[in-house]
A protein has these predicted regions:
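P-loop NTPase motor core
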Residues: 48-53, 58-135
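Flexible glycine-/small-residue-rich
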Residues: 18, 47, 77, 148, ...
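Short loop/turn segments at connectors of secondary-structure elements within structured domains
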Residues: 10-11, 69, 150
Length: 176
């Protein structure tokens, strides 16, 4: 929401694709302050119903970005529907995810794109892996991992390895 507000306060439009239906108007209001209604006018919120609808939405977003005046695209969470789709149609799921990532990569050449994604623990090698694997990883310019324990920290994996400790408060992240 902070990234979106940065551009919304400059009177630019932001596209927010919310697959998990987790966008909190209350949190947006809290962070945006008294002008939140004006900022909402420039926020384009998409709520895809499934992985195919997400695919269509990303294609539509590409057209909107081409038309101009969009300053940022946020996808929260890319792999939410992908994970479910993969249980029945893995080949098609991977093909669609590749296409979606390619579109997002093209968009990112014009404007910033922020994608949140799910991870899972690999039992075989005891590591945390990205849902969508190499499809997502190789097409991402920057990879950031949020770790809760033993302390809250952000691990920037790419472009260069770094770690930052943080806490959360009403204003968002507070870096230590």
């Amino acid at each position: 929401i902070h990234a979106a507000l940065h551009f919304l306060k400059e009177r630019k439009k932001v596209i927010y694709i919310d697959t998990e239906k987790g966008f909190s108007l209350e949190r947006f209001q809290q962070l945006a302050g008294e002008h939140y209604r004006a900022y909402l006018q420039s926020l384009i919120l998409f709520l895809p119903r499934n992985f195919k609808h997400q695919h269509e939405t990303i294609q539509q977003v590409s057209s909107l970005v081409t038309q101009g005046n969009i300053a940022l695209v946020i996808i929260d969470t890319l792999s939410y529907y992908y994970r479910r789709f993969m249980k029945n149609r893995p080949d098609l799921g991977n093909t669609m995810l590749i296409r979606q990532m390619n579109i997002l990569e093209q968009i990112s050449k014009k404007i910033p794109v922020i994608v949140s994604n799910q991870v899972y623990s690999s039992v075989s090698d005891n590591t945390v892996k990205i849902v969508g694997g190499i499809i997502v990883e190789k097409r991402s310019d920057c990879l950031i991992e949020l770790v809760k324990e033993p302390r809250r920290k952000i691990i920037v994996k790419r472009p260069e390895q770094r770690e930052l400790l943080f806490t959360m408060n009403d204003s968002g992240f507070c870096f230590l």
